From Swiss-Prot:
Transmembrane segments: none annotated. It is found in: Cytoplasm. It catalyses: tRNA(Glu) + L-glutamate + ATP = L-glutamyl-tRNA(Glu) + AMP + diphosphate. The lineage of its organism: Bacteria, Pseudomonadati, Pseudomonadota, Alphaproteobacteria, Rickettsiales. SUPFAM superfamilies: An anticodon-binding domain of class I aminoacyl-tRNA synthetases (SSF48163), Nucleotidylyl transferase (SSF52374). This is Glutamate--tRNA ligase 2. It comes from Ehrlichia ruminantium (strain Welgevonden).
Amino acid sequence: MLNHVVTRFAPSPTGHLHLGGARTALFNWLYAKHNNGKFLLRIEDTDSKRSSKELIDSIINSMIWLNIQHDGDIILQSSRISRHIEIANQLILNDKAYYCYCSEEEINLEKEEYTKKGLHYKHNCIWKNRNPPIGNCSKVIRLHSDTEGITEFKDKVYGTIAVNNVQLDDMVLLRSNNTPTYLLSVVVDDYDMGITHIIRGTDHLTNTARQLLIYNALGWKPPEFAHIPLIHDENGNKLSKRHHALGIHEYKNAGILPEALLNYLLRMGWSHGNDEVITIDEAIRWFSIDKVGQSPARLDSKKLEFLNNHYINATNNATIIEMIIPIIEKTIGYKVNTEKIGYLLNGINELKKRTKNLVNLANESLFYVEDIPISFDQESLIIIKSNHDILSILYDNLSKVLNDDWNNSTLTSMIKNIVKDYNTKIHNIYHCLRASIIGRINAPSIIDIMVNFQREECLNRIKYARDMVK
């Protein structure tokens, strides 16, 4: 266990929290928890045009739903702009940065020349070692970058990473409108927050090299870095906010349990032997960066379905019902009464065994809680319309069964007698019972359902179905 570990998650509220961001948050949180450290949350909201309060709330709510809990107060990067400006000016005073008076037009022309020559663009500022022009000219602050040698750091996933300094230009630290750039703000915030370890995607590798130049210019000790491979879709294509990547709120709305999604994210690039189902307590106990692979992780919808089914079945029935009742009530348009919830509580175990998600489970549970008239699928309607006589026979015979005798043995025996007495097929009887009582053919044991519903509910449903085709 390491001493004094502080990690952070620093999303930009230009979109909802998606899988890649959630996995980054999870890995940082687990690393901090494993080492008895702190996990901080910073919202990088300095892009005022694309950031919004709604997206900030969405990110925070998604993390609450996932139960990834941060320590201390949430830090808004926009509240620290004066500190970022202070550091930029400090770099000027220490001759680690300079004012660049090049116009946007001049820079664009310079880029075009590099493109024509097929060269990697690197700005060569004519003002780097000159006196400023006369008058009130627009300017930016740029870092004095070393054009020789390499910038090297040890990554906890990929080992030693070396970037040729020729590729790193004199990056802008402060724009002409006096707003700090991402590269400067992140370094200042991470330093002030005491961040010791940064875990983020490999798409930040170049940013890390650039940020190390800023750390060096300021004489600050940088944190340790771990870059985790990106997540690809099932076809091996890179996920992004704009393509393929579902927001965490969409997984929630699709009926995925947070425990299942966390387990799924955990296994994307990290492993513990052959274990697939890993509880959050086990994850905290076992997590280490050296078990993160270097290859991109791929989405696997079948694995997510498997994990979700596992956690649904591991959750007690009362809790699951509490989760699906709002979905059911939205579907049927009225409040479910307490007696019907009792039916569902008695029968939900069989439904849980084969469900993929809570939405699917809610739909499969409708017949338990619907008032008459219940909903019928197309196959059930066809059976009902073509079996009026059988439904009448079932109603008449079942009406003779007393409440005290309404059990599995009596009902099974009566159905066998009906098959014999009326020269019909047993599967036809069961189809008619399913169609009239639950509105569909594919379902758990209809006898068990009838015992659960008890006499009056079953007779009322059969009577309604019979009378539909008078």
